[in-house]
Amino acid sequence: MGHFMSIRVLTGITTSGTPHLGNYVGAIRPAIRAAGAPGTESFYFLADLHSLIKVQDPERTQRSTLEIAATWLACGLDPEKVWLYRQSDVPEITELMWLLTCVAGKGILNRAHAYKAVVDKNRSEGGDDDAGITAGLFMYPVLMAADILLFNAHQVPVGRDQIQHIEMARDFAQRFNHIYGGEYFVLPEAAIDEQVATLPGLDGRKMSKSYGNTMPLFCTREELKKYVFSIVTDSRAPGEPKEAVGSAVFQLYQAFAGVEECSMFAQALAEGLGWGEAKVRLFERIDAEVAPLRERYEDFMRRPADIEAMLCDSAGRLRERDAIPLLARLREAVGLRSLSLCMASAVPVPQEKVALPVLKQYREQDGRFYFKLIDGQGAVLVQSRGFASPRDAGQWIALFKQAVSAEALVSPMLEPVADPVVVLAALRRLREAG
């Protein structure tokens, strides 16, 4: 997975509900096909904190998170090539949310579509504007902005109904950058896929849980067959020509078959293929693609501990690489700093000029690359462990120089630090020296 030099693409995954074929064709399959594209670093997170706005059943929350993680892994998302993590495993997200809350305008949040929709519904029913509205629903756009800005995502694939949230994230980022005088955040862009496929449901309308017309992605082969055979069709009998265009059976077939197969299927319908036989062909075509995914899904569901370990490992590495260093910079920017350092700078004491600390990068006989922080008298304050390349060491040095808390000095890549206060003071001098 790349770092800094790639375009960062971040995708949030809802962790409530059971995935259906419409989710698979319209969101899961295209997202996985796009994952790991050259020059792209892909981030996928399970939005379990967001789910708490609507779901307050602990068992359901836990189960849904497992099912959704297993679904994406079964469908081919490779955690060796992309970042897959659970939102609640990255506490810096909620800390950043608070920092953004302190610069977000309430007027902007008042205009959020989800919030306004509930207010309008309450008014139409003659109720209080805020009846049934939690602070979580109202603050949802700020949490979404924190999801995006913590990893400085360049692009966020969303539907048109979500563009407003990306615009809000840009607004919060610009406000923070302006108030605190730095380029702390990249301004994200909404990536709109105009070709998003929508599948018809069992009744011919768009497949949607709200219509109750969905086909679960991982139902059994027998259940899938029953769903397919319950698709509503017209009354034309076998032998009568049938229009492929507008037919739910044909539209579903198109989502799982190639151009040539679809052409042959349309021709067969025009020549009088019966709906019963057409549904048999549709069922076999869908099952041919879904069956191996179903098998992988069932395997993952039998190994929840493996999924847990993978999610925790991914979140831990992302926190160390991106989240903790950025929050250290933001804490420094807003003034959440060590008071001991504040006292040192607030009460200047005349003293002899002392040489600046220095960071030295070098190569050892083992072929690995190291760095150390040395104070003005030549004493080693911090010693790194070995890196595979000078580029890796250099990137880590850049992050290390921004450390403003003792927690940031605790890392597998650093030898234990004896005196964090002295080290933080030395790093502060380096930053002030420019």
UniProtKB/Swiss-Prot annotation:
Subunit record text: Homodimer.
GO CC annotations on file: cytosol
Pfam families recorded: tRNA-synt_1b
Reaction equations catalysed: tRNA(Trp) + L-tryptophan + ATP = L-tryptophyl-tRNA(Trp) + AMP + diphosphate + H(+)
Binding site for ATP: T14, T15, S16, G22, N23, G159, R160, D161, L199, K206, M207, S208, K209, S210
PANTHER family: TRYPTOPHAN--TRNA LIGASE, MITOCHONDRIAL
E.C. designation(s): 6.1.1.2
Top EC group: ligase
InterPro entries: aa-tRNA-synth_Ic, Rossmann-like_a/b/a_fold, Trp-tRNA-ligase, Trp-tRNA-ligase_bac-type, Trp-tRNA_synthetase, YegP-like_sf
Residue ranges annotated as motif 'KMSKS' region: 206-210
Role: Catalyzes the attachment of tryptophan to tRNA(Trp).
Annotated family: Belongs to the class-I aminoacyl-tRNA synthetase family.
Binding site for L-tryptophan: D147
NCBIfam families to which the protein is assigned, alphabetical: PRK12284.1, trpS
Keywords from the UniProt entry: Aminoacyl-tRNA synthetase, ATP-binding, Cytoplasm, Ligase, Nucleotide-binding, Protein biosynthesis
One GO MF term: ATP binding
Protein name from the UniProt record: Tryptophan--tRNA ligase
Compartments where found: Cytoplasm
Keyword Zinc: no
UniProt motif ('HIGH' region) ranges: 15-23
CDD domains, per database record: TrpRS_core
A biological-process GO annotation: tryptophanyl-tRNA aminoacylation
